[in-house]
Amino acid sequence: MFRPTFNKGSDPKRGQRGFSVIEMAVVLLIIAIVAAFVVPQIMSYMRMYRLGVGGRNVATALQRARYLATSNNTLAGVFVAELQRVDIEQYDPMGKTPPQNMGVVQLPDGVTVASDAPKQIAFDGRGVITPTPKESPTIRLNGIDGYYLFVTVSPTGQVTVSEATRDDRT
């Protein structure tokens, strides 16, 4: 009554089940070819992403230093201590005590501050750069494979981050 019935016409013969080795090899070859094109693009995107994160972190450090200066009506700024580290410092207006470290920004792996970037940018109690520069200070961040971006501070304290671009000369 409930016995399954087999149709002899649809019964696969021995050796005709599953995929052949050639079919599997073709599929693996297609996957390898696609991966050869996609993986470098993903790696390039990740490098640009890390550079963008570093730029936003430096911009945040500058904005925090400006906030410290305006909220405490004192001097505060950022100091590029190393190629991959930016310190946020608050200064004694009288100059009697050393600067207080108010925070540290560690840049992601592979992201460094350019050697020609300003080593220190300070804000006064009004939130403007002191001493007043002739032009807006610009910090260049370098990434891997020639990618770079700029963090620019206007004399009034406005911070902007450029898009990551690639230097084709490298």
Regions found by a protein language model. Give the residues of each.
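N-terminal helix-rich module
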Residues: 1-11, 25-28, 33-63, 67-170
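Acidic/polar helix N-cap motif
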Residues: 13-15
